[in-house]
Amino acid sequence: ALVLRHFLPLLDKQGAMAMLSAKVGSIGDNHLGGWYAYRASKAALNMLIKTAAIELARSKPKARLLSLHPGTVISPLSQPFRGASAARPADLAAAEMLQVIDALGPEHSGSFHAYDGQALPW
């Protein structure tokens, strides 16, 4: 919330701002349970992004505020949970998310997308 408060006023009228969320923050895609605090924090972040995007559209209708899921990225945090999933290097995840940001227009402001551009359910 503090990042949005301080940086949204600086956003160009056609600019984009993306926040890192996670697929586990999706209520509609929760089929495994667990991770209560992490899921709740990412779901709250998604609500914050959606709400702020509505308000941003009033003053900067061509700007974009997005919630992005980077996928499983190789890191100490993901190490215990990777299992059979294919974790990707952080630089690849970042490059893919930049492509998603560039591909999404203002009509997608406030939306939740994965690194491959797939729209994710709230």
Predicted features, each with a name:
Residues 63, 67, 75, 80-122:
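C-terminal helical subdomain
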Residues 2, 6:
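Short, conserved SAM-binding segment of the class I
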Residues 9, 13-59:
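Catalytic loop of short-chain dehydrogenase/reductase
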Residues 1, 43-54, 91-98:
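Conserved active-site helix of classical SDR/Rossmann-fold NAD(P)-dependent CH-OH oxidoreductases
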Residues 24, 72, 119:
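Residue-level detector of flexible, active-site-proximal loop/helix-junction positions
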